[in-house]
Amino acid sequence: MRMLNLGVVAHVDAGKTSLTERLLFDSGAIAHLGSVDGGDTRTDAMDLERRRGITIRSAVATFTVADRKVHLIDTPGHTDFVAEVERALGVLDGAILVLSAVEGVQPHTRVLMRTLQSLGVPTILFVNKIDRRGARHTGLLHDIRRMLSPMVIPCNSPDDLAPMPLGVPAAEVLAEHSDAVLQSYVDGLDPRLLHRELVRQTGEALVYPVFFGSAITGAGIDALRQGIVDLLPTADPASSGELDGTVFAIEYSGGRRFAVARLFSGTLKVRDRITFASGSGRATAVLDADYREATIRAGGIARIGGISGLRIGDRLGSATATPEPARFRPPTLEAVVTSPDEGLYAGLSHLADEDPLINVRPGPQPGSLIVSLYGEVQREVIAARLAEEFGVKAEFSAPQVVCVERLKRTGHAVKRMGETLFVATVGLRIEPGEVDSGVRYQLEAERGSLPAAFMTAIEDTVRAALATGPQGWRVVDCLVTLTHTGYSSPVTVAADFRNLTPLVLKEALEKAGTVVCQPMEQADIDMPADAVSTVLNLLVRCGGAPEMPVVRGDSATVRAIVPSGRLREIEQALPGLTNGHGTLIARFAGYQAL
């Protein structure tokens, strides 16, 4: 049986979880059709998800259709949980992008579509809620072609949901990537050729089939299920080779911790030793997507227990693989968290294990912690989970924008034995690096000049100290070079280097100087042409730098670089300035000096 790892993605309230529930029910995987409103869906397993009616964490469920075993990955729709979506996208064979026939193409829909396209994920579009009052048909198809991709092919009728034969309109789309279809215009259209090309081009993410239906009533779902079978590529479980997989989630079940991974090649079973970037370990449990102990083959989803060092993003079978670059913007807010209750650090560390971008770190007051956030909904969810799962009543400060520090120039400092209380010599040079290069560390001093434990103590301390620069923000994009070392055996201990290194680094940073940089967003705004002047005024008022607007008939588009801290203000003002017809898509655009 071939395997398909299928993601379901959408903007919030498009009906994504309802579609997941319908696919599971119609395939016989569940006996009862749950509902989001009823709080009894299979993939929204957390009490908090059921109460709020939103998906917070990606969840995996399994069903069988024809000769396919489908691992269905339901992802969050709210933009505050976009990190969950990003982790899931990297392990998919195909995706269903859900749109609401009532709300239409939303800004987050466009962000998701753009990301799926950049990853080359074969994608089916499902227009949900076709039975609702206010549902749009032809006009929505026009919006899909204009805002998402012109390379779409409707596969059933939006009016009666009957199958649509592949005719001239489909051939015109398929001919863009097929000389055979182009030739068929002369020789006469061959439906079998068109179907073969639809399958091929869907699998290569060149075209995007569109299905209409209703997850609640089940209308159009049979056609969608057949499209999943016919059009989306599958993984071959017989794929041989060395173990290769990616950890995309951390779960806790029955008091045990599991790393959830998708395998791309090889096999994995209990007691196998697994190598990854930060070490290796032996799996004491290997469960399949249905929580049964099994041997997992290529294409499968494995829940791996017993290896505490496994983290999200780790590549199984490789000790050298580097993480994939982020495709969604990082969190640009942070808040200080305090609590009178014990267990704050343990609770937040647990949540950060599931979502590393929370990035828990020490706060300004004793016992306080700082967390990174995407928005208010995520803050509310973290507070609720701390209270319900760990008995911790946490208070959050007002979120502030996360800035960073970049070096102005090169700085160098040396402190030798005898000059301080520490029996050690350390010299460090710090210099600006390339944008997005992170913190790099290298040796100029001879590697054998210090025992390995002392070398490790220096590097670890450098990286930890750069988390808080001279102006209170993280220092980024720099190269740190260890230039001088010295010790006195047997008096010197690792603590001498851990205590001396921050002093040397502080002096080097003071000589280099730093500049505070704020996060920026590239905002693309679509609006009626008559709203251009007021929107431009808004962008300038919020510190943005707009480009020349592009006007096409009665609509217009403008791109601007704006501070992340003002983005929410722009989003809130836009509907009033455009009579509800303005849409904004933002992507992280790096950092800019204040």
Question: Which residues make up each language-model segment?
Answer:
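P-loop NTPase catalytic nucleotide-binding module
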Residues: M1-A14, H32-L33, V102-S253, L268, ...
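Conserved nucleotide-binding/hydrolysis micro-motifs of P-loop NTPases
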Residues: A14, I30, H78-T79, V102-V105, ...
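Active-site phosphate-binding and catalytic loops of NTP-dependent enzymes
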Residues: I30-D37, T41-S58, P150-N156, V207-Y208, ...
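Conserved nucleotide-binding/hydrolysis modules and their immediate coupling elements
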Residues: L231-P233, S239-A335, Y345, S368
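Long hydrophobic segments that form regular secondary structure
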Residues: G266-R273, A277, A352, V360-G363, ...
